[in-house]
A protein has these predicted regions:
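N-terminal intrinsically disordered, cationic/polar leader segments
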Residues: 1-92
Length: 92
């Protein structure tokens, strides 16, 4: 399995999940597709990118992170629970 860092720099595009793939569309045209399980990180550079909840859940479920940027500088990170705490703590 290969891991990729995906940069989304196209302003006004939308990210959706279809059959395990992250799909990027703009103006009704598909710009690209990649298997969510192959991602280690998604870097959102464009400020007007629409992301579906299924994409958030899919990326985080596969232990990847999402980095949010403004003016091409990181301003926040979405991280899966497995990277923020030990699950054994909440099981007991």
């Amino acid at each position: 399995m290969s891991y990729h860092i995906l940069h989304i720099s196209e302003h006004g595009c939308g990210l959706s999940k279809e059959r395990g793939l992250l799909v990027c569309r703009k103006d009704g045209k598909t710009l690209g597709k990649i298997a969510i399980e192959d991602l280690r990180a998604v870097v959102i550079l464009g400020e007007s990118v629409n992301i579906s909840a299924a994409v958030f859940a899919g990326v985080l479920d596969n232990d990847a992170i999402i980095i949010h940027c403004r003016n091409y500088k990181a301003v926040g990170v979405s991280v899966p629970n497995s990277r923020t705490y030990d699950a054994r703590v909440v099981l007991n």
